[in-house]
């Protein structure tokens, strides 16, 4: 009797675990017009699309430079230490001096304004976006929504937009690019209401594209933008024609189990050439433990650290620069720059300046807290997406997952590329490689839809 009971319990437990690991829940019920603006929804919604120009105004610049000039003396690094304890404050001094003396605010604003900028109100929030239409004839134009992550903005894409909107030999299509600032980032308005998580941002971005007249479109995204885009592909598969991501990630429970099981026989779990990107797991966990302190703070107490970062441009620069450096090359802690040399300093200071002038560091960091606060996020994570997906994995991306794990979430992974260089801010660091992969991925998306069309036609 006892052995039978034990066997029955074991079988039941196994079935329960299997169900949990492989379950595909129903999508959450979402209000697709949920109001995120101040107060209650307005009776008449402003649907206008307004031209917008970026200006680094004199008052902001004067105040910023005064604060930088009056900064306190920083504590020097320990003897023999470069960036192992965080940003090298001697190096930081040179960056701040450059920001005050040599960073050309007008020139940088003019460069950003080479693209048409707009704002429109979506669900109570003014959303900023760049929209560049290609000047072409006899070439198919594919609408492409581009979404960034933290601590970035649509500025991140200023190197790739010109390449994406120009025809290239061997391709019979080009892109119309819509690069949007996530709510609370860059020039997009943040909310004063809790709950604006990546799922809800996905709804906002879908509504933005519909406002612009796109019923169907493609998406390219990284970091938090990739999370929002993945949720869009999951929830709106009839509208998202293809998803290209430079931070591919499956957050399903079975994916975590596979990651752990793969540690037992790494050569069976991942191509031997790339095994050291995730195995041995102790190295991965050591890296994540070393570099994820900011993540935990922002996911729990963003408003507290936000006080210091809002009040001090030196502190804001140090905080953002250190993370941009490590995510561009994690192996250069023994240098003063900590990895920042792989990015153009003016691009980095554009990001810091945009964050400072819009006072949006707190509203951007809150996404870390919101991303884990509501069960609807994990629910959508657990639902597979059948939208054709392309993944590109740069060398120093935060985390790498092999295709056999990615397919837990992305059932139609039509292209997967592994790059032996680059990092998290791909559009800034390796714009040519990213652009090439977007074009090649679009070829696969078009093939996927043509094949499905032939199958449908044969069945009628």
Question: Model-derived features: where do they sit?
Answer:
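Terminal signal-anchor or tail-anchor transmembrane helices
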Residues: 1-29
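Conserved hydrolase catalytic core segment
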Residues: 3-4, 17-20, 163-174, 212-274
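C-terminal subdomain of alpha/beta-hydrolase-fold enzymes, centered on the catalytic histidine
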Residues: 13, 17, 298-460
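Short, contiguous pre-domain boundary segments
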Residues: 36-50, 71-74
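Non-catalytic accessory segments flanking enzyme active sites
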Residues: 60-133, 359, 363-377
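Glycine-rich "HGGG/HGxG" loop immediately N-terminal to the catalytic nucleophile
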Residues: 105-107, 155, 182-196, 230
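Conserved HGGG/HGGXW glycine-rich cap/lid loop of the alpha/beta-hydrolase fold
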Residues: 137-187, 442
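Alpha/beta-hydrolase active-site loop
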Residues: 193-211
């Amino acid at each position: 009797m006892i052995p039978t009971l034990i066997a029955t319990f074991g079988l039941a437990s196994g079935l329960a675990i299997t169900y949990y690991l492989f379950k595909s829940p129903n999508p959450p019920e979402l209000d697709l017009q949920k109001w995120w603006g101040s107060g209650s929804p307005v009776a008449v919604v402003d649907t206008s699309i307004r031209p917008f120009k970026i200006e680094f105004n004199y008052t902001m610049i004067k105040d910023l430079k005064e604060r930088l000039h009056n900064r306190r003396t920083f504590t020097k690094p320990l003897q023999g230490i470069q960036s192992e304890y965080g940003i090298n404050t001697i190096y930081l001094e040179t960056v701040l001096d450059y920001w005050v003396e040599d960073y050309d605010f007008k020139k940088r604003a003019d460069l950003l304004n080479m693209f048409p900028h707009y704002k429109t109100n979506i669900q109570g929030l003014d959303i900023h976006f760049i929209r560049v239409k290609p000047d072409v004839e006899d070439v198919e134009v594919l609408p492409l929504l581009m979404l960034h992550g933290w601590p970035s903005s649509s500025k991140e894409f200023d190197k790739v937009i010109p390449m994406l909107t120009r025809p290239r030999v061997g391709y019979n299509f080009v892109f119309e690019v819509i690069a949007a600032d996530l709510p609370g980032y860059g020039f997009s308005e943040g909310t004063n209401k809790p709950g604006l998580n990546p799922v809800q941002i996905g709804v906002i971005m879908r509504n933005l594209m519909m406002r612009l007249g796109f019923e169907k479109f493609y998406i390219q995204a990284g970091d938090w933008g990739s999370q929002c885009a993945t949720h869009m592909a999951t929830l709106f598969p009839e509208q998202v024609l293809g998803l290209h991501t430079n931070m591919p990630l499956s957050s399903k429970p079975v994916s975590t189990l596979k990651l752990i099981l793969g540690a037992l026989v790494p050569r069976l779990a991942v191509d031997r050439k790339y095994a050291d990107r995730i195995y041995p797991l102790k190295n991965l966990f050591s890296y994540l433990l070393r570099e994820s302190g900011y993540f935990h703070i922002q996911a729990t107490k963003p408003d507290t650290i936000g006080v210091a970062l809002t009040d001090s441009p030196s502190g804001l620069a140090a905080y953002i620069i250190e993370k941009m450096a490590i995510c561009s090359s994690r192996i250069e802690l023994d240098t003063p720059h900590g990895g920042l040399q792989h990015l153009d300093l003016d691009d980095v200071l554009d990001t810091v300046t945009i964050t400072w002038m819009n006072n949006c560091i707190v509203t951007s960091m809150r996404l870390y807290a919101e991303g884990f606060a509501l069960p609807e996020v994990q629910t959508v994570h657990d639902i597979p997406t059948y939208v054709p997906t392309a993944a590109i994995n740069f060398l120093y991306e935060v985390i790498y997952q092999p295709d056999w794990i990615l397919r837990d979430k992305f059932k139609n992974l039509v292209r997967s590329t592994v790059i032996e260089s680059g990092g998290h801010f791909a559009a800034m660091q390796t714009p040519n490689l990213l652009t090439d992969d977007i074009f090649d991925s679009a070829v696969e998306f078009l093939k996927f839809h043509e094949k499905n069309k032939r199958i449908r036609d044969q069945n009628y």
